[in-house]
C-alpha cells in the first residue's frame, strides 16, 4: 500500500483482514533511524489513524533486527556538536535539529503516534531494539520478543537521555528503580530479562508469527469495544504526555552539543574511556 510521502525503502504497509502490517524496511542497516525513516514512520502512523478497516496494527522490522536505534552516521555529526540547520542535504541528521526541537518533536512523534492510533498496536521484536528502537517498541500497546533479542536504553553511551517518549513509557511499565537503572547504565538486556521485568509482554521463537496470531484474535472482536478499551486505558497517559515530553525536549536541548556530550561520542569512536568535566 502506497503511503503519501513515504519511501518504501524505509517503511512498508499492507492491510489484510483488518490487520495493518507495518514493517521497517532498511534491513541492510538493521532498520536504523535516519531522517527518511523518521519521516516515514511519522507519516505511516498518521496515515493509519484514518485508514478504513484497520482493527489492529503489527509493527516489525525486516532482516536481522527490529531497530538498532539512531543511524550510525548521525553520531559522527553529534561528535562535533552539529549546528542549528535541521537535516543535512545528504540525509544525515544534524545535531542542531535535536537541540532546537525539530527532530526531538519528530522523534517523539514516531514513538507516540502508535498510542494515538485508536486501535491496538503490537510490536514484534527480534535481533536488536536499541536506543530509539526500544523507545519505538515502547510506543506499542503489546510487545512480543524473541528470548535472545538484545534491548537497551542506549542513550547514556552517547551522553544524552531517552528523549523519544521513553521516560514516560518506561515509567509506566517498570518499577522506578528498574527504569532508572536501565537508563543510568544503558546495559543490554535479553528478551528473557525484558519479559521478567515487564518490558515485554510475551516471548516467542517467532515473534512476528505470534504477533499476527494475536492480532487476528483481537480483530475478531467488536472493533468499537476494542477502540473504546484502548481509549480508556490511554486517557491518563495522554494527560501526562505533553508535560513529560516538553521536559524531555528541555533536557536534550541542554545536553546536545555540550562539552560532556561531545566527549561521550568522541570517546566512543576513539575507543577510549571518556574524560568528563564535573560541574561545580
Identify what each model region corresponds to:
Residues 1-62, 280:
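Conserved CoA-thioester-binding segment of acyl-CoA-metabolizing enzymes
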Residues 27, 144-149, 200-246, 253-254, ...:
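C-terminal long alpha-helix characteristic of the crotonase
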Residues 61-113:
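Glycine- (often His-adjacent) and acidic-residue-rich active-site loop
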Residues 101, 124-125:
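Structural motif
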Residues 109-116, 124, 130-183, 197, ...:
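CoA-thioester-processing core
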Residues 186-193:
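Acidic, divalent-metal-coordinating active-site segment for phosphoryl/phosphodiester hydrolysis
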Amino acid at each position: 500500500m502506497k503511503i503519501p510521502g513515504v519511501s518504501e525503502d524505509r517503511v512498508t504497509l499492507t492491510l489484510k483482514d483488518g490487520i495493518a502490517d507495518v514493517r521497517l524496511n532498511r534491513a541492510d542497516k538493521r532498520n536504523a533511524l535516519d531522517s527518511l525513516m523518521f519521516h516515514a514512520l511519522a507519516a505511516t502512523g498518521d496515515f493509519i489513524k484514518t485508514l478504513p478497516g484497520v482493527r489492529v496494527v503489527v509493527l516489525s522490522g525486516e532482516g536481522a533486527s527490529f531497530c538498532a536505534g539512531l543511524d550510525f552516521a548521525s553520531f559522527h555529526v553529534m561528535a562535533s556538536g552539529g549546528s542549528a540547520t535541521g537535516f543535512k542535504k545528504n540525509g544525515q541528521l544534524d545535531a542542531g535539529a535535536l537541540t532546537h526541537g525539530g527532530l526531538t518533536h519528530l522523534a517523539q512523534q514516531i514513538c507516540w503516534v502508535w498510542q494515538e492510533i485508536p486501535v491496538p498496536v503490537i510490536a514484534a521484536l527480534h535481533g536488536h531494539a536499541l536506543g530509539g528502537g526500544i523507545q519505538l517498541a515502547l510506543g506499542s500497546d503489546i510487545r512480543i520478543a524473541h528470548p535472545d533479542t538484545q534491548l537497551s536504553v542506549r542513550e547514556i553511551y552517547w551522553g544524552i537521555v531517552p528523549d523519544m517518549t521513553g521516560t514516560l513509557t518506561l515509567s509506566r511499565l517498570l518499577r522506578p528503580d528498574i527504569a532508572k537503572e536501565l537508563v543510568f547504565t544503558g546495559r543490554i538486556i535479553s528478551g528473557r530479562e525484558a519479559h521478567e521485568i515487564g518490558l515485554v509482554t510475551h516471548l516467542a521463537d517467532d515473534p512476528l508469527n505470534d504477533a499476527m496470531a494475536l492480532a487476528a484474535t483481537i480483530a475478531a472482536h467488536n472493533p468499537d469495544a476494542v477502540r473504546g478499551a484502548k481509549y480508556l486505558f490511554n486517557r491518563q497517559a495522554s494527560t501526562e504526555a505533553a508535560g513529560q515530553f516538553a521536559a524531555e525536549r528541555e533536557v536534550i536541548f541542554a545536553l546536545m552539543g555540550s562539552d560532556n556530550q561531545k566527549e561521550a561520542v568522541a570517546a566512543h569512536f576513539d575507543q577510549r574511556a571518556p574524560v568528563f568535566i564535573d560541574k561545580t
